[in-house]
Structure formats: C-alpha cells, structure tokens
Amino acid sequence: MRPVEWDIVLKLLEIVARQDGKIRPIELENIALAEGVFKSKTTGTPLAHSPRFYYRKALEHLGFVENISGKYFISKSPPILELISKRATIDSNKKRIIAELIVNNEDCKKNFVSLFLLDDKCKLEEIQNKSAYVIAKSYSIEHKQSSAKRSLKPIMLTSPLLDKNISIDTPDRIHAIFWGIRRWLLDVEAIDEIITSPKAGRVIYFVNPSIGEQLLLLEFKRFLRRYFTPNRDWIKIYLPDFYEYIIFNSQMRARTSVIKNFLVNFINENKSSVIPIPISGTMLNAEVKFEKQDAAFKRSFLNFHNIGYVAYLNINKTLI
C-alpha cells in the first residue's frame, strides 16, 4: 500500500477491461507505458519499476482486479463495474466508490479505518455522519540494526473517543499506512485533517459532505455563546478553537475548506461587527513534527491578501 494517483488506477482498470483475462501483470505495465499512462505528472518521464509495482498491487489489494493463474480479470462486483462503465477520469462519484472500497477492505480497516468506527459494520455514509476522530503524533525510539543504532520516527495513531491506538513503528508500516491508506482516503476526499497546535498532533476525521454554511452558522453561534457574558460587548476567539469544537464536540465535521469559506463569508458580511486579527510570524513558523506539517497547521488560519494570516476574530455580541 503506497501513494497512487487514482486517475492512473482507473486508466489501468480500463486497460484490464479491454484485455480481460488475457494479460499478465507485467504485460499490463508494458501496455500502460506504451500508452503513456505511467508518466510522472511533474516531469513527464516514465514511472520507475517500484511505483508501477505499487499501482498493480493497489489494483489487486482493493479488489479492482483478480489475479487468476497469473492473468488479470476484472472484478465483477457492482462498484467495479460502475467504475469502468464511464470515462477513466476521476470524479466525485468515483471518489465515493473508491472510498467505500478502502473502508470495506479488511487490511485498511484493521490498520487505519477501525480507529474511526463506532460500529465495526459501519458503511461509508454512516461513518461520515457519525464517527470518532484520530490524532497522529510522532515519537522517537531506538532501533538496532547491524549492531548500529538509528533513530526512527514512528507515528502513534490514537482514537481518544474509543480509547484505541495503532503504533506505526517501521518504515514499511509508515509508508503503507500513513502515506498509503491515509493518503488514499485524503485523495478521494473521504477524510480531512488539520493541526490546531504543532504539539497537539495532526487531527484526522471523516468528512460529512452534507454540512454546508447554514448548518455551520448555527454551530458557530452555539460556539460563540460559550464565550459571551452580559457585561461584554466584544469577545476575541481563536480560530483553531472553533475547528476543535467542530471536530471534537459535534458531528458537523465539514471539510476544512468549507469551514474556512464559511468564516470568510461571515467576516465579509459583517465587517462592522467582526475584526480579523493577524497571527504573529513566530507562531505561524512554529516548529512542527511531521514532514509538510506546516501546511496542515496553516490550514487552521484564514489568509487575507491585505493583512496576511488571521488567527483571531473580535466579534460583537449583536451577531449571536
């Protein structure tokens, strides 16, 4: 299980459908190379053997194809047949189908998805409506190899609501679970993640796609009521606190981009009653633990071209 581009997976599936039961795995690679499917999106050069191998394994592992006597056959399950009934390009419906395949896969469930499940038999739609969240943190251990010690950066996945955790403590498991299964679900927009504090870790959650700005407005006003007192006309709120409120204390788990769009619109529609306060450079550049963690941390804030990143809002009580 390694990172893959789902549009490439669908093109491979289309090739197998054309040659159903007639080609071997290596022949699929050769056809995909000849048709320009196995190309790097950044450099345009053909993919090396290892990533091509991982693409084939993703096809097999998630049940897109069956390897029978060394030849590839298309799975006859309805979701797979639906994927190949249209153009081999990714869209929201195909992302949903792929997300369901990942969620229902036993290895994916055991090593990642189970941490979110309030019921082991939950389907994707039920998980999106009601599920636990997971916190990912790195830690250090000593690992002996060839009489020499080397420092590893394993990752602990913790589900506070379920009191469960999974330790990803080897390079293979880190690649397979954190950069494999997690990345798969991110890319099909089934999950999202945010870092509200570098020390708190990366918060990962299943997105409820039905949550829009009207529902977020109701939830935002509930959040604001926790801070207002009768003798105060204004209150300062910290935006990551609102994200935590949404993710930890409600089932209104919208995508971070949806929450940010709501906040931007709320500010623009109430300019006389909402004052954005920018974040300091020191806080924005706080030390992070994961590769590319800074991008997830910045997602907690709003970015306005005229004032930069905004971490706080001063809000007048008339808006409650």
Task: Place the predicted regions along the sequence by residue.
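Donor-sugar nucleotide-binding helix/loop cap in glycosyltransferases
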Residues: 1-284, 307-319
